[in-house]
Design a protein with these regions (language model features):
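Adenosine-phosphate binding glycine-rich loop
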Residues: 8-13, 208, 318-377
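Short, Gly/Pro- and small/polar-rich lid/capping loops
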Residues: 9-49
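Conserved active-site and cofactor/substrate-binding residues in soluble primary-metabolism enzymes
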Residues: 13, 17-20, 86-89, 123-134, ...
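Glycine-rich, N-terminal phosphate-binding loop and its surrounding beta-alpha-beta segment
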Residues: 48-56, 61-120
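Glycine/serine-rich phosphate-binding loop and adjoining beta1-alpha1 elements at the start
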Residues: 83, 103-217
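Rossmann-like adenosine-cofactor binding region
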Residues: 252-344
Length: 377
């Protein structure tokens, strides 16, 4: 990926890193090996080959996955991402993190994750729809409102969730809104779901700032990633009075000491343009690494996993890190941050807002729970 930090040494294996972190945490808690042995292994792993007819009539075959890590607390829950770097080990790690995340916020879900190895920007709207429908058909035996409930993730959105719901419902012969969350409001989605993860990041950031005695209105913040999560977090924190001094996407970053105009930047990005194209007085362009090592109160990695590595950790100047992305910090980097007394709000808490609101969306038809944003947040 252009602009993001990539470890050029031995290939990073997120699943092995997750296992290492879990074992270290278990040791700190004084757990016996038998207490967590089952959590080292996913319950089910499905790899599928997805043939798709392209607009020119040719056939391309894409690689897809659905991993169910644990159903011990309830139906499996986890997003589906479309990204060219998706592989089995990444999806396995993400599914395990979902298990831990749902347990941390005490909602009755286990963990799952799905993904397709594709760059969705290279596909037309029709090709993306055909890919989604075929992928859904191939993971159909695993998913269902009482078994495994997908949701949006990187490069997937409410429209794609709507296609999944429609395809699943066609096979069942009746409408099944509960098979996915994060779907359009018009077909049973939650009004608060789209920005829920970013809003949760904002709430976690405010909480940790208050605990550290830093006035929210005086806090300086750098955000790596301006997608669904990072963009929403930036907007919410900006409205709270924080000074957003640096942000980035896959094309690079920008910096303004006095604080970026996040409303103007968000409007610019919503036109489909990238940060490398953004030009304003007082704004200078920097690299993603420079965003990560900005001299700020709070760093929010909101892009991919494996961004804060050993090489980066020693140069970080932020006093607080709020992990909006899943697995952005490697286990070795985490040790360095701890030795430097840098506070880390872990991903399984910091970005749990999305799955919490997904739970409300899923449970609403079964109860009288309201899913309007004021009630959710």
């Amino acid at each position: 990926m252009r602009g993001l930090i990539i470890n050029m040494g031995e290939k990073y294996n997120p699943y092995e890193d997750m296992l290492k972190s879990m074992e270290e945490a278990a040791d700190l808690l004084g757990l016996e090996k038998d207490d967590y042995e089952v959590l080292k292994y996913p319950e089910r792993e499905l790899k599928v080959s997805i043939p798709v007819e392209m607009d020119d009539g040719s056939i391309r075959v894409f690689e897809g996955y659905r991993i169910q890590h644990s159903s011990s607390r309830g139906p499996c829950k986890g997003g589906i991402r479309y990204h060219e770097d998706v592989d089995m080990n990444e999806v396995k790690a993400l599914s395990a993190w979902m298990t831990f995340k749902c347990a941390v916020v005490n909602i009755p879900y286990g963990g799952a994750k799905g993904g397709v190895k594709v760059n969705p920007r290279e596909l037309s709207h029709g090709e993306l729809k055909r890919l989604t429908r075929r992928y859904t058909a191939m993971i159909l035996p695993l998913i269902g409102p009482e078994k495994d409930i997908p949701a949006p993730d990187i490069n997937t959105n409410p429209e794609i969730m709507g296609w999944i719901m429609d395809t699943y419902s066609m096979f069942k012969g009746y409408t099944v809104p509960g098979v996915v969350t994060g779907k359009p409001v018009e077909i049973g989605g939650s009004l608060g779901r789209k920005d829920a993860t970013g809003r949760g990041v904002m709430l976690m950031t405010k909480e940790i700032l208050q605990r550290q005695g830093i006035p929210v209105s005086e806090a300086s913040i750098a955000i790596q990633g301006m997608g669904n999560v990072g963009g929403a977090a930036a907007r919410e924190l900006y409205l709270e009075g924080c000074r957003i001094v640096a942000v980035s996407d896959v094309t690079g970053g920008i910096y303004q000491e006095s604080g970026l105009d996040v409303e103007k930047l968000s409007a610019f990005l919503q036109t489909g343009k990238m940060i490398e194209d953004y030009r304003e007085d007082g704004v200078r362009h920097i690299t993603n690494r420079e965003v990560l090592i900005s001299d700020v109160d709070v760093l929010i990695p909101a892009a991919m996993e494996n961004q804060i590595t050993e090489e980066v950790a020693g140069s970080i100047k932020a006093r607080i890190i709020v992990e909006a992305a899943n697995g952005p910090t490697t286990s070795e980097a985490d040790k360095i941050l701890n030795s430097e007394n840098i506070i880390v709000v872990p991903d399984i808490l910091a970005n749990a807002g999305g799955v919490v609101v997904s739970y409300f969306e899923w449970v609403a038809p079964r109860t009288v729970v309201s899913t309007c944003p004021p009630r959710i947040m």
